[in-house]
A protein has these predicted regions:
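Glycine-rich phosphate-binding loops of nucleotide-dependent enzymes
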Residues: 2-8, 13-269
Length: 269
């Protein structure tokens, strides 16, 4: 692989103090076609890492395999927490991932149409703090424990009326990101977190990502807006045809001939 070591990104922090995820011999096929075939991949050596590649490279499928929402055909995926106690993610039910600090945003936005913005976020903090969902709505003291944190994110992203429903794709995207943050992840997977957002909100999302990584969370981003990748990530993994074929610091990846030919095109270095 190119660039066997990556330069430090915008956020510092040794890998030993952060959780990592290891993917070993992970294969997934659909209708006889192999869409992911990853021999050995470690995510989390840098505070913020990027996963890029052309459409159909297997990026989102790999993220879903990590979350076990798409089961592996073979192989294993494990969480290596900072305390060293390995957790076999590929043996966990998808709904138990957040209990181990592994949280993923959604490329296809969750359906928030049946809950108000406020109620959607209350459910997230209920899950994060292991509260019974009904208590957070019915008991004032439980509600008050989480009110300030929710209001912070609502104000930061400019949700004008939290008692309303998230209507636009952009609002739903931001609401999904806030939901992830309220779950207090130790390892955060973000699938196209800035897709469709205006420039000012993209900048806010980037700031939040830096902040959460600065607090000790490992972050991996799948993103087609490469300015986000180049500006945030300390290490970038390049996927093509289901495999991770290159990894390195952003500069070495963006200049590599394979990336230019298969993804960027001439004139984009």
């Amino acid at each position: 692989m190119v660039a066997e070591h990556a330069t430090a990104g915008a956020v510092d922090g040794p890998a030993a103090t952060r959780p990592r995820i290891r993917v070993q011999g992970a294969v997934k096929s659909f209708s006889g076609r192999v869409v992911v075939d990853v021999d050995d991949l470690v995510l989390g050596n840098q505070p913020i890492e990027g996963l890029i590649g052309p459409n159909g490279a297997g990026k989102t499928t790999l993220m879903r395999m990590i979350m076990h929402s798409t089961p592996l055909d073979r192989g294993r995926i494990s969480l290596l927490p900072a305390d060293g106690r390995e957790v076999m993610l590929s043996s966990l039910a998808a709904h138990r991932m957040s209990r181990h600090g592994v949280v993923k945003s959604n490329q296809v936005i969750m359906d928030f149409d049946k809950l108000t913005i406020w109620d959607s976020l209350l459910l997230a903090v209920a899950e994060a703090s292991y509260e019974q969902p009904h208590r957070i709505f019915s008991e004032r003291t439980v509600f008050q424990r989480h009110e300030d944190e929710i209001r912070h994110y609502l104000d930061y992203f400019g949700f004008a009326d939290p008692t309303a429903f998230a209507m636009s794709a952009g609002e739903k995207k931001l609401l999904d990101i806030v939901r992830c943050l309220l779950l207090k992840p130790s390892f955060l997977l973000l699938d196209e977190p800035t897709a469709g957002l205006p420039e000012d909100q993209t900048e806010k999302v980037m700031t939040v990502i830096r902040d959460v990584a600065g607090g000790g969370t490992s972050v991996v981003i799948v993103e087609h807006d490469l300015n986000v990748i180049w500006n945030l990530c300390g290490e970038v993994h390049f996927m093509a045809e289901g495999s991770v074929v290159l990894r390195g610091d952003p500069q070495s990846i963006r200049e590599h001939r394979t990336v230019v030919e298969k993804y960027l095109g001439e004139g984009h270095v």
